[in-house]
């Protein structure tokens, strides 16, 4: 699907702006209705003056989205350009964020988590088949299509995605709690970084807190570099061995041994009937509330400081390390891996 930029003097001649939905680093998202129809879109409005020096980021996002058509991926429907703005008309999803929906449920089981992860795996497997690496998979980028109970899950936010022309990528980027060890070490990396992030997400979906978690950023990254995490009691006592085996294959430190999306889709926890059906909502929702509602999950991440501390720990030799330009957009901190939350 080729979407050419449509030039317009005034976007209000194309869409009626209904209300503000949110904002990003250099854009605002509004609910808009197409003139002459009842069709609604999420219109991403990007001032050109805010784009100076960042044009490649938006062009990359458009290039990636133009190639994608999948039922579990938020679609780019149109691109408009005015003298002052660039506008991306995105498919409107109305079901809310992943964690919010889990908290609102009447019950939640391991089978529900398996179904969610399977949908995301299918979408990411599709991206990988096109040579696209998302590079920023995290719960905030997983949205429900509708408010209904049977709604599908959607993958969003392709601002850091990359079309992998060769075998490997080199620029370090992503959100620290979800980045793979090879990315932190600034080794050449590929699609396996998305699988690692899905391992982190799967872990959280089953207990409500992350596998790598510390108040100290250097310790957090040291844990990731060592792939050091635990299935803590009592939080994991009622979770199946199949689920734990699945997560171990996704959080494999060696990207060559880590599952691909296709291998993950074939694992019995996804494709079979090994996921338990007992209600874990109480425990999971309590931990999500404690671990993800706090502002320290959103604070800015200082890549330069991280590199300095990690080198002191001897994890990355001098002269190597993550790119200080693209290292990350946000950080989280909290508990040590292997420790249950203490509040």
From Swiss-Prot:
| Record's function text | Calcium/calmodulin-dependent protein kinase belonging to a proposed calcium-triggered signaling cascade. In vitro phosphorylates CREB1 and SYN1/synapsin I. Phosphorylates and activates CAMK1.
Q: In the record, what terms sit under GO molecular function? A: ATP binding; calcium/calmodulin-dependent protein kinase activity; calmodulin binding; protein serine kinase activity
Does Thylakoid appear among the keywords?
no
Family membership noted in the UniProt record: Belongs to the protein kinase superfamily. CAMK Ser/Thr protein kinase family. CaMK subfamily.
Where ATP is bound, by residue?
21-29, 44
Q: Residue ranges of region Disordered?
A: 319-343
**The protein's name:** Calcium/calmodulin-dependent protein kinase type 1B
Q: Where is this region: Calmodulin-binding?
A: 290-311
Q: Which GO terms describe its cellular component?
A: cytoplasm; nucleus
Limits of the Protein kinase domain: 15-270
Catalyzed chemical reaction(s):
L-seryl-[protein] + ATP = O-phospho-L-seryl-[protein] + ADP + H(+); L-threonyl-[protein] + ATP = O-phospho-L-threonyl-[protein] + ADP + H(+)
Q: How is it modified after translation?
A: Phosphorylated by CAMKK1.
Q: Where in the cell is it found?
A: Cytoplasm; Nucleus
Instruction: Give the enzyme class.
Output: transferase
Task: Provide the E.C. number(s) assigned to this enzyme.
Answer: 2.7.11.17
Please name the catalytic residues of this protein: 136
Keywords attached to this Swiss-Prot or TrEMBL record, sorted alphabetically, are: ATP-binding, Calcium, Calmodulin-binding, Cytoplasm, Kinase, Nucleotide-binding, Nucleus, Phosphoprotein, Serine/threonine-protein kinase, Transferase
Q: Name one GO biological process term.
A: signal transduction
Indicate how activity is controlled. Answer: Activated by Ca(2+)/calmodulin.
